[in-house]
Amino acid sequence: DSKNLTDAQIQEIVPKIKELIPYKLLTLWPEKYNEVQQTKNLNEMKALLHNQAIKRLYQQINADLLQAVLIDEFCSPSNYYRYLGDQSAPLKPITYFKTKGESHHIAVAAASMIARDAFLEGLKTLSKEYGYPLLSGANTSVDELASKILKQEGMDGLRKVAKLHFANTQKAIDLTK
């Protein structure tokens, strides 16, 4: 289970995984996330991104070898397809959903590790770009850093590096008072 690995272990393993398997990775940066979050919930965003990644990967691989698509279930299959709206889901007949899929199938564990590695790399990129040592999670250090960014850059600055609907934002606002 990839959840039992440290970030350092994941960052060491992922380059090897990427050499061995085809994959597609889509990143939704905080600023765009905050924009989309105004009209779509998290599961809807995830469904749309999953579907796009699946369609792009399908174009890259030998379709004759594809036996199934397994999605780490983050919402019910009926909601997943409802969230897609008018987007096509060409692999629906062979798409399966599994809760905690990373514990049951190596492909989902690999995808989970690639996603975590991308998240960590994204934090590094945003840290360099905006000049703050960005942190993840929900703790006092994160709240204090968000408050510092808010004081120096305003809400527009925080919007570029944080998901504004998280509780950390209100805590950061409270700390600026």
Question: Where do the protein language model's features map onto the residues?
Answer:
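RNase H-like, Mg2+-dependent phosphodiesterase core
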Residues: D1-K177
